[in-house]
Amino acid sequence: RFHSRVAATLDEAIGQACSETGAHALPSLRAVRRHLEAIEQAEVGVQAWRDARVRRLEAIDELLQTITYVASECTCYVTGRAGEGHVDDTGPAIVRVVGAASAPQVLDALESHGLPPMEVSSLATRMGSLAVAHIIDGLLHVDLLFLPDQLASHEPFSIVDGEAVPMVDIVNFSRLIQALRAASASDP
């Protein structure tokens, strides 16, 4: 359903599939994402799927480099699934932008460097309400979360519920991409 674009979100696709099949137990999002990956790999081939994943990660890396160029006072982290090298159409990659003096100034600078205008919303967190910029542009599907420079902003825990989350800084994200690229090249 999600893969064929009948449903707009994974939750909607799961609900429709359960309704149609009469299933009472919902599969986990992880199981659904694995199933979606398998469908995509079967459609385009494993190597093409790996190459596409690396290109999406490289687009995020380029965004991180641009952020650190236009706002050198900021520290960036990639969190969640993207921080482990998993990107797909099921949701945005999450990037924490820590220490930005002003989210609007950073966003203006990013737009002056070629990014499209971004929709901005707010997110209720344990630190209060924070600005979130939503980027959907080509290979980029990213939410930028603007956090104050506090200890909690630099720790690998969800700023919403406090649960542990994968988190890598810009250097380790680049290393992750290099490792995935090398693994993809050596394992055709």
Mark where each language-model region is:
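Short secondary-structure transition/capping segments
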Residues: R55-D61, M118-A131, D161-A179
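Short, low-complexity, polar/charged sequence segments that are solvent-exposed and flexible
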Residues: V95-G99, G114-M118, A152-S153, D161-P166
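Conserved catalytic core of two-metal-ion nucleotidyltransferases
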Residues: L115-L151
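Active-site nucleotide-donor binding segment shared across nucleotidyl transfer reactions
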Residues: D61-A93, V97-L110
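Helical scaffold of the NTase/Pol beta-like nucleotidyltransferase catalytic core
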Residues: F2-V78, A133-G138, D143
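A short, terminal or domain-edge coil/loop segment
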Residues: Q65-T66, G83-G85, R126-L140, F173-P188
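Short coil/turn linker and secondary-structure boundary residues
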Residues: R5-A8, P27, A101, V165-V171
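Catalytic cores of NTP-dependent nucleotidyl/adenyl transfer enzymes across multiple folds
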Residues: F146-P188
